[in-house]
Amino acid sequence: MAELYERFIALYPYPHERIRHGAPRAELNRRYFEHLYEGKNRGTTPIVVALDPTLLGTIENNVSLRTSTPVQDITADTVERYAHELITDQHHYLDQVGVEVAAHEAFRHLNESAYLQTYRRLMENGELGEDDIGTPLKAEYPFELTAGIINEKVKATDIDSAAELLIMDLPLRDVSGVFAYLPFGGWDSSPSPEAMLSIARYWFERDDAYPAVIASDFIEFYTPVPVTTRRDAEILAVEHTMVSSAMPVRVYRGFDKLVEALYGQHDWYLWWEQLPRRRSSLKRPKPA
């Protein structure tokens, strides 16, 4: 893992903090918040990177494909140039169509049937469910990053194969640009970096949702203003389903459970079942 870490920070020479394996989950939550609030004054955006060979390989492949640079020749300058080009192209696209249209086009491209049959109807006609969710607003879920839960459970014998958590401060004010600097996805059914830029920008403007974690097979967002109506929870649940079709069945045991999990939730978790090199055994603990 030492070689992996050295390669990563050579590509990303930005201030960062390493979270030790087995650290209490509260430590990651606390330090992430501190980086987030400090970053607003410094013009930086923190992101928790769950570094493992698969994530780094995905990033390198995405950068290599767009820049026509062999993986072994990718440098920090290559990554920065890639990110700036992606962000510039995204800004031009948003100037033409707007943030909402760009996100909706990304949703539709990812899952056209869900977009046409469910999402558009929900946006136009109201709620899918008949009854309001009964959770009182004062019973909001506490903020807790799944990456911290996984890291807390890492045993000494598993350290060599476990992802290492880094809180990295990227030179960004536009938080959606995280997906340009760390181009997650583009394999199997996972969104491309370009799609995630559009979706993340939409979620930030509408929901004040910050990208919080990028791992090889999942991402997390943090929002200080969780959804508090059934309609908003259903809209968000359909959006999450379009981004990751495995979420309702493989993680939350049905769409209604996903709706309930997002209601009052400060942490959004999106997970993909397939990986380009291996299948992951790490999934979010299922709610009771």
Annotate each PLM feature.
Residues 1-176:
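Extended, low-hydrophobicity segments enriched in charged/polar residues
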Residues 22-26, 190-193, 230:
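Generic detection of long, well-ordered alpha-helical segments
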Residues 47, 165, 179, 219, ...:
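A broad, low-specificity signal marking well-ordered, structured residues that form hydrophobic/aromatic
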Residues 56, 186-190, 227-228, 277:
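Short acidic, S/G/P-rich loop/turn micro-motifs used as interaction or catalytic elements
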Residues 156-202:
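Surface-exposed, low-hydrophobicity interaction/linker segments
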Residues 194-197, 217-288:
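Alpha-helical oligomerization segments
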Residues 202-209:
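Short amphipathic beta-strand starts and helix->beta connectors
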Residues 210-215:
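Short beta-strand
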